[in-house]
Regions:
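Lipid interaction determinants
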Residues: 2-4, 18-163
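Bacterial N-terminal signal peptides
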Residues: 7-17
Length: 163
């Protein structure tokens, strides 16, 4: 019985080798494409950076110019201890937030009420406040530099770079 088992075990590697097929691309082993995977996002990973707006597009893919009033001071988001702060607008804007799976849930935003000398800054306050409300889909990439993408309920996409 042991001899028969030993004989069968000797044939097993040969059978496995014979069953392997040669790739149809001339014998080269196919390589899987390298795909960047999104990192798990949590409040701690958001709090380690200042998030500067790099790109903003509406649902049709058009740039949202109202969010780019100051080229030298892009809109910035800071996350800290359940609070979201919007910087580089006319007024100070903030609210609560929490993360649930792939959603950033933003509470009611509050703002100071300073008069803005530049109407474009007033529009910036309104434009960013309208987009940072409710449930936003959140995507986080731990690349260098890290990237944050928010997709609003209205279909707008806001892309930030972490500094």
């Amino acid at each position: 019985m042991k001899l028969r088992l030993l004989q069968m075990m000797c044939w097993l590697p040969m059978l496995v080798a014979c069953s392997a097929t040669t790739p149809s691309n001339g014998g080269e082993t196919p390589t899987a494409p390298v795909v960047a995977t999104a990192a798990v996002v949590d409040a701690g990973s958001l709090a380690t950076h200042h998030w500067r707006l790099q790109r903003a597009m509406d649902r049709e893919g058009r740039r949202i110019d109202a969010l780019f009033v100051r080229a030298d001071l892009p809109v910035q988001l800071d996350f800290n201890e359940g609070r979201l702060a919007v910087l580089n607008a006319c007024n100070r804007i903030g609210g609560s937030f929490e993360i649930e799976n792939d959603r950033l849930i933003v509470g009611a935003m509050i703002s100071t009420k300073m008069a803005c000398a530049d109407p474009a800054l007033t529009n910036l306050d309104r434009a960013i406040s309208e987009r940072l409300q409710g449930s936003l889909r959140i995507e986080f990439s731990a690349d260098t530099p890290p990237r944050l993408r928010l997709l609003t309920e209205g279909g707008d996409t806001l892309e930030f770079i972490g500094e």
